Amino acid sequence: MAEGLYILGKESLDSDEYDTSILIHEWMHYFENKLSRSDSPGGNHALGDKLDMRVAWSEGLASAMSSAMRGNASFIDTLGARQGQSSTFSVDTQPVVSDRGFFSERSVQYAVYQLSRLQGGAAAVLQTLLAEQKNTPAATSIFSFAAGLAPRMAAGATDTVFSDIGLPSASTLDAWGGSVSYVTSFASGIPVVDQLLSGIATAPVCVSNQYGSYNKLDRNRPIRLEVPAAGKWRLVATGTAALARVDLYRTGVWQPPVNEVALAPVLENTYQLQAGTYVAMLTDASMYNGTAKPQLHSCFGVRWEKVS
C-alpha cells in the first residue's frame, strides 16, 4: 500500500472524510511520522484505555493538535445511518484521577492542548516536536516531549499542566520518566523504563497482558541499554517458564540481531552495534504470537554484555 492518509469513508457507517477534527488528527500522525518521530506500534485504542506510552503519546498529541489548529476543544466523530450519530469529547477536560498518567491518551491530549495555549506554547510545542522529540534516544512519550519542552518555556510555566495529569513538574522529568513510578496488579513502585548499563539487571523485568492487546500498558517493557564502545553485544533474557521476545532500537530505528538463539526459557540476541544509547522492547513471545492466556504475567532475568 502506498504511503498516504487513509481515512474511513463508508456512507451510513463512518464518514470520517467529513469530520474535520478526525482529518486533522490523522494529518497530525502524518506530520509526526514524516517531520518529527513516532515510535507508536499503532493499533486499536479508546479513551480510558491504559496504553503503551508510545501509543498514548501519539494519539493524544494528534487529538490535541487537531483542536489547537482548529481553535476548538471539541472533537467530533459522526457515524451511523445518514451520519445521524456522533461521538464527542473535549480535549480541554481534565481527566479523572484513574485516567491520569503517561499511559493515558486523555492525559496527553489535555496536557498538549493546555501547553499550546500558554504564552509561546504553540511555537514551543512545534519546535520540540521537530528537534528534541525527533532525536531523543528514549522511546517517544510524554516524558521525552516534556524534557525537550521545559527549556523552551518560562520556569514553572508548565507545572500546573503536568500536575493536572498526575506527573511531576517538567523540570524534574527526564526523557526516560526517571522520576516517575506506577503500580501494576503484580507489583508497585515500577519504574517507567528499566535501565541496564551492563551486567545483570538488579530486578526481574516483567510484562503483562492484563490491560489487553499488544499496544497496551505493560505488554512491552522498555529497557535502556548503554553501549560505551562499538562491537558485538549480547542480550540474554531468561524466563522461569516463558520465552522472551526482544526488539532493539536506536533513536527509533530497529536494530536487527546478527544472531538469535531462542530455546525456552532462554533468549540470546547478539548485535553488532555502534556506541550509543539503545532501547530494548521486551515482551513474552506467547503474547507477541497471540497464544498467551488472559491475565498472564511473565518475568525475566536480563543480562547485557559485550561479546567482542
What is the predicted role of each segment?
Residues 22, 26-34, 60, 64:
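Catalytic glutamate of the conserved HExxH
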Residues 229-231, 239-243:
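Short proline/glycine-enriched turn/loop motifs at strand-loop junctions of beta-rich domains
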